[in-house]
């Protein structure tokens, strides 16, 4: 009887250790993701500070990812999505289908490249990841170049900091002011992530 009780106790203790381990790993993952997202937001807020420029802005954006010095088997991605992730090649996938090298698994049926699901003709999308993926389409280059040439002073520092098409789309979809009607009100509460030049249609309050 004593041996049976000891065995049951050991099993319970082992399960508690497993649960504690799972909880600890989940907590570390959550804190890491939150820290990265906050770090990026702080960087953007700092870059948005207005400065005067007497000369044309020396844009550094490179639209040809093939010239990148980054290893070809590694991908940057949008990082913070809870369910979806977009990699720098324009693929959107579920977070569970993200490979260890940071790229979406293109062999999974749900992975799509240059996906504009939920995006309007104005260039505003219902999901951040689809906004970035759609923005990465090669035919969006001229639109983005026009935007860079007309960027408001308040955004000049932000977009001077980006170096390629992917970074530009990440910043454009995340910081667009075109989707905002008032400080805490979106013109379209659904399609609020914008890479385009035109604001979304204004929804009545």
UniProtKB/Swiss-Prot annotation:
What residue ranges lie in the Cytoplasmic compartment?
Answer: 1-16
Transmembrane segment boundaries? 17-35
Give the GO biological process terms: positive regulation of SREBP signaling pathway
Keyword Chloroplast listed? The answer is no
Q: Where in the cell is it found?
A: Golgi apparatus membrane
Q: Please report the record's description of how this protein sits within the membrane.
A: Single-pass membrane protein
Annotated glycosylation sites: 67
List the GO cellular component terms.
Golgi membrane
Coiled-coil zones: none
Record topology, Lumenal segments? 36-205
Q: From which domain of life does this come?
A: Eukaryota
**Primary location:** Golgi
The alphabetical list of record keywords is:
Glycoprotein, Golgi apparatus, Membrane, Transmembrane, Transmembrane helix
Q: Does the keyword Transmembrane helix apply?
A: yes
Purpose of the protein: Positively regulates hepatic SREBP signaling pathway by modulating the proper localization of SCAP (SREBP cleavage-activating protein) to the endoplasmic reticulum, thereby controlling the level of functional SCAP.
Family stated for the protein in its record: Belongs to the SPRING family.
How is this protein organized at the quaternary level? Interacts with SCAP.
Record's protein name: SREBP regulating gene protein
Upper lineage is: Eukaryota, Metazoa, Chordata, Craniata, Vertebrata
